[in-house]
Amino acid sequence: ALVFLAGCSNTKYLEEGELLYIGAKAKVADSAMSRKDRKALEDELEGLARPKPNSKILGMRPKLWAYNIAGEPKKERGLRHWLRNKVGEEPVLFSQVDLEYNANVLESYVENRGYFKAKVSADSTRRGKKAFAEYTLKPGPRYHIREVEFPADSSALGEAVARANRRTLLKPGAPYDLEVIKTERERIDSRLKRRGYYYFNPDYILVQVDSTVGKNQVDLKVKIKAETPAQARIAYTIADIVVYPNFSIKTDTINYKPEDVKQHGDFTIIDSSKLFKPRIFDRILQFQRGDVYNRNDHNLSLQRLINMGTFQFVKNEFRISDSLSTALDAFYYLTPLPRKSLRFEVLGKTNSANFTGSELSINWSNRNFFRGAELFTTSLFGGIEVQVSGRNKGFNVYRIGNETSLTWPRFITPIRI
């Protein structure tokens, strides 16, 4: 009976004139398109239509049913409130559907896929107290890429973008697709970030589309937007590298004495507590003074700092150097975890040999044992197990021991390509 109600009685709760919205159906009217491609495109279009109808399981809408049978709860707790607000789902009405808006969304979507002459019409069908939307797409011909140009200007940035054409995702003969163009912009941005362009972003790349070349083809021209700010046009190098290994997140200011500052190679270490040996940062931080900024080195340095297991918070900033406008100062603000910790554990256990017992362990750890981010742990444990049945009932097993380990941080050196 409950299954029948969940599947069939939801519409009886609707007000006069209300219709339950049960979804969208899309039809692609193009005999030249393969059946498989038509079906795939129809599924994509149906997924874009809004709002979504009430969820279904095996053809039924149990969440809507739970919402309806709960009624309006009189208080903000209890079974009715839980059913209606936690389990239930408010009915999606056909009056919430904007057919014209959805048609425009679907039309824009297929245009972005290269169907520049696409037209979408919308209609609806009513069945009793239910209704669904119908969208018909006449896609027209799909435009394909004829040629791709990366014109270089005289600037270093323009030349860097032009050199990115060797691995472009925009291929002559491929269908026009806005998503591929967006991915290409991100690819170029990623390439530039590895070559010093810290302030660049994909929005500064313009892909001009010329659809007037005929034969349902387009020409693409990839270039830098004229309004790209000056900072984004600079390939930065690394100047000062400053590390604060004992940074407190509880304060916005950093106070230190001259004797707290230690110069270690290219790194300036400011550590009033002398928590760490400066040489540990040689293996972790990938930048050196004079290096061209590289996003891969940036991310790898942060990843290694986090994976050390020594710091609770890791924060990194790059700022334009006061001494050179084409260089960046790198700052690393590191908040250590408590150096020492003590943990107690009590375990209860049983096994198939009818032994039952418990174990107590005391674990002590030091996350910076020799001031080189080494992890020293020692555990003292003891326990007893008693056989509660069987031939050796009452037989006791005692266990006591100690485990000690010392782990040094190790990093695999990346292969530069």
Question: Where are the language model's segments positioned?
Answer:
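Gram-negative/organellar outer-membrane beta-barrel architecture
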Residues: L157, K274, N294-I417
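Interaction-mediating elements
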Residues: S9-N307, N316, A327
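C-terminal motif of bacterial Sec signal peptides marking the signal peptidase cleavage site
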Residues: F4-G7
